[in-house]
């Protein structure tokens, strides 16, 4: 038996969630080990859909382009009868994102891309390594590992992160109950070729409704490749049975062939009560599992890892205290709980609505679904929910704001006083805990510039606006705010002064930091910045803090409370 020195982070599980966390820790220069008991990436891809918000996160990691090159986009979801009559059409393209679609990519291919990216960052996956047990101490966790050949190892880690799936060894070792239910039916799916009886769009998914149950087909990379999914199919997953499912539930004359793999599994709806216990934390399926309706499980897990990674980075480097990690549970547990509720309702609804056997009941169902789904507000709500762009942390303990009432300011303290209209317009800007909008704006010679790429890199970003006033006094105040952050946080904070012109103001001639020109005011309007204000953006792209007027004192007070 060998014993290693104290390790900052031990990650158990090298699926998409564990790999995402490892990539994040690499970027934040946090030493870690990533262990996985399997000897190769998964073959059976239960997960396949990547939604808009997850793709934004992968863009930040530098992976989105490669993922998009290998994946197949789906820009709409259709519910149809067996004779191709469309009942519901949900478009996913009307979003404020560079990724207005669902991407279909097998979990195996995603794992391979993440593993390759991790290797480029110097990270290693230690395969055929199993976590046997662990014991928590005051300031570390003692972990017992087993390797091939009966070799054992003791690892002492400051933090143990369980990304080891639904049967998590870490969760079981913590004794946390996995609260919820198991559905009475099973899910059967396969990666197959489908020759449709009539030509179909290659960028749309379809669910066929029949008296025998639903049958879904999602486009995959490759010629005529699809993920074929059947709920409550009693037969074993064989090619003959998938053809039978198509004959019974899908359109006539369609041929299923060339399966790459086929699988059947039970689906659950479960979640732990807390994501952190001492120095052990849970991510992804180790913390929550639910029905695959909506394809949000993988996305929720990846976003768990993305939320936790930057916080571990700040704690490791001594910028923040250990208590910051408590916010991981406070922010991510409610998100998964909402997903569980919505997918549970949808799954149970499928069991009732989609298996109506009588013609009149099906006709009534189809008419009601067609009417409701045609409403623009329903379309937008469904699309936003699927994309996960509306995920927010409004009730998080680590977000906040300070906004002075217009009549409470004199304007003689170096700050510019907002008017009453300025006050209300600022209130309509992105609230603390909200995702930062990916604003398109014109700047210098660039006709279509995006905001989010300017906020990549894993740092906190401070957006400093002087509003419409654009006075020398206002700009001097903004530079003072930026200068006050530099001695405390160095390059972990990036300050951007945003000006409503095409030229650098004379008052900023000596400003060496980031200057964003916003001559048409797109950024100012998006952030409600009619007057002087600031926004602090977290490394994961959410608003941490905002103030009107821009105040370095209130910003530093906030950071002192959050980081400790």
What are these regions (language model features)?
Residues 127-141:
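A conserved short coil-to-beta-strand element within the FAD-binding core of flavoproteins
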Residues 26-46:
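Glycine-rich FAD pyrophosphate-binding loop
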Residues 69, 116, 159, 163-267:
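Conserved FAD-binding catalytic core of PHBH/FMO-like flavoproteins
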Residues 43-119:
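Active-site-adjacent segment of FAD-dependent monooxygenases/related oxidoreductases
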Residues 7, 149-159:
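Core beta-strand elements of the Rossmann-like FAD/NAD(P) dinucleotide-binding domain
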Residues 2-8, 12, 27-28, 81-84, ...:
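Helical substrate-recognition/capping region of FAD-dependent monooxygenase/halogenase enzymes
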Residues 18-19:
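N-terminal Rossmann-fold NAD(P) dinucleotide-binding loop
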Residues 70, 236-300, 320, 325, ...:
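FAD/FMN-dependent oxidoreductases across multiple families
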